[in-house]
């Protein structure tokens, strides 16, 4: 996969993309990330990319010229192929694990990082295919959200994590929150690892992890359960857990 990131601050991406999983993915030719400075395509001597908004108002708006020129450059470089074009913005569609899996199936992505008050609407109407938000809050620019999207998408590319099971056990991959993890030592300051994880019985361990995943989701993000495909055993376990939590709540109220 190739991801082109259009930004006013390409240096912001050097650290996050040159460490850990993303670094290995690029070294193994599973992922290519190119950052492109929008200012390089400004048509004036001062390399400015913004101007005051028509109709008045506070702040500055990123103009269409440098972004359209930037896309012309990308098309020329990639034989007319740019792939899906994502604009990071607060009013976009919420970014989810399912969205990340969908984007990971693409060969090419372009991510546009806005700044200032916003981007000229003509860019959105003509060039952009997807608008994505990582949450109901406003950030200074689209760079940090772009990093989130790249990291989440990269994890879904086959081979990036080494083992597919590692990605499939992540929270949200199958709609549920992830089960707890433990490592050595077996006992630390009186806190012990659950005995079942030391049993070597893989079937029982798998059931325990599934139960813990259902419990965490029920306690912390119950709204997720309505969209999860549950087996008969899952439904049985959920009913037990709901009754257990109800019983505990009633005891606390007395």
Curated annotation (Swiss-Prot):
One Pfam annotation reads tRNA_m1G_MT
Q: Which SUPFAM superfamilies match?
A: alpha/beta knot
Binding positions for S-adenosyl-L-methionine?
114, 134-139
Q: Which reaction does it catalyse?
A: guanosine(37) in tRNA + S-adenosyl-L-methionine = N(1)-methylguanosine(37) in tRNA + S-adenosyl-L-homocysteine + H(+)
Please tell me which top-level EC class this enzyme sits in. Answer: transferase
The biological process GO terms on file are: tRNA N1-guanine methylation
Question: Which compartments is it annotated to reside in?
Answer: Cytoplasm
Tree of life domain:
Bacteria
Biological role: Specifically methylates guanosine-37 in various tRNAs.
Cite the NCBIfam families for this sequence.
Answer: PRK00026.1 (NF000648), trmD (TIGR00088)
Protein's name in the database: tRNA (guanine-N(1)-)-methyltransferase
